[in-house]
Amino acid sequence: MAFILSIGTSLPAYNVNQEKAAEFARYMFQHSFKDIDRLLSSFKNGQIHSRQFVKPIEWYKEGHSFEEKNQIYIEETLKHSRAAVRECLSHPEFFQEAIPYEKVEAVFFVSSTGLSTPSIEARLMNELPFSPYTKRIPIWGLGCAGGASGLARAAEYCKAYPEAFVLVISAELCSLTFQPEDKTKSNLIGTSLFGDGIAAALLCGEKADRRVSKLKLAPKIMDAQSVLMKQSEDVMGWDFTDQGFKVIFSRDIPTLVEKWLKTNVQIFLDKHKLSFHDISVFLAHPGGKKVIDAYIKSLGLSSEKLSSAQSILQKHGNMSSATILYVIKDHLQNGHKKEAERGLIGALGPGFSSELLLFSWEKGA
């Protein structure tokens, strides 16, 4: 259906290690839980070393109106999307020369952590020299599954228009959804996991001119599968309050992954007459350490097949939908690739839902 040719990323300026984040959580939650020390162990045991935020950590101690937070979301998302797209279209590791903006036929913009109408990609088109005829497809509300879903929908677009070049932008500022007055355990655990991140991926159809690509081997998306678990709205998502986005985050997510995901993956692989042993790498959205452990246990994978997911979790935490693009970029730059080997891209999100993509390594140019 489509090739992934490049990924560009942009990270906010404020880097926070887990020790500092745990101190912040103690300050915010110490009077709400008698077992605060036990709960704070999740910061140390979660295999996250650092995360990045759009504001200094002290800023989050005070309450801010939804209006203020959403205005910051628009400004910061636009700034970082611009940087990620520029890198994506001109990354010297991926291209011999930059891809012209006018060559991009469609832009898929994915987010779940703020609101903007016109949507961010429209604002971006006023700042970068895209053609005014570029198709815009904003995708909102898929949470952590959004990046994989954006790639899948973009690949399907390329199947219909095989000469097209298409951008997928995923921008999540999870930190701006933090509500200091929310003293629930879900909010505390979320404080140990989520960070901010923005990324852009360039895809092209099978008949597109890829001669400028430097990739010896590129992931060619062959198929995608979306699955919804019915009656599971309470697993993850948002409640909307006067203060903005209030996190819904079930403690049962790792168990659901372990019990539910394997069947979905098996059905997807059976469709292509493949087995788990045929999959050389799983480029997964790393929801957290327990989710990665559930992937390994449920799918019978070695930790090596999830090394990029583990690496990104350590460096950046859970950046919601943007995370999967960071994982793919890490593997493009550092991972093992062999022609014709198969791999999976996967993510889970609100619904409760899963998005899976099957790819093979094919000649990039």
Swiss-Prot record:
Keyword tRNA-binding: no
UniProt-listed Enzyme Commission number(s): 2.3.1.74
UniProt GO BP: polyketide biosynthetic process
Keyword tags: Acyltransferase, Transferase
InterPro entries in the record: Chalcone/stilbene_synt_C, Chalcone/stilbene_synt_N, Chalcone/stilbene_synthase_AS, Polyketide_synthase_type-III, Thiolase-like
Annotated catalytic residues: C144
Reaction(s) the record says it catalyses: (E)-4-coumaroyl-CoA + 3 malonyl-CoA + 3 H(+) = 2',4,4',6'-tetrahydroxychalcone + 3 CO2 + 4 CoA
First-tier enzyme category under EC: transferase
Recorded superkingdom: Bacteria
GO terms of molecular function: acyltransferase activity, transferring groups other than amino-acyl groups; naringenin-chalcone synthase activity
Residue runs in coiled coils: none
SUPFAM superfamilies associated with the record: Thiolase-like
Family affiliation: Belongs to the thiolase-like superfamily. Chalcone/stilbene synthases family.
Protein known as: Putative chalcone synthase
Annotated organism of origin: Bacillus subtilis (strain 168)
Gene: bcsA
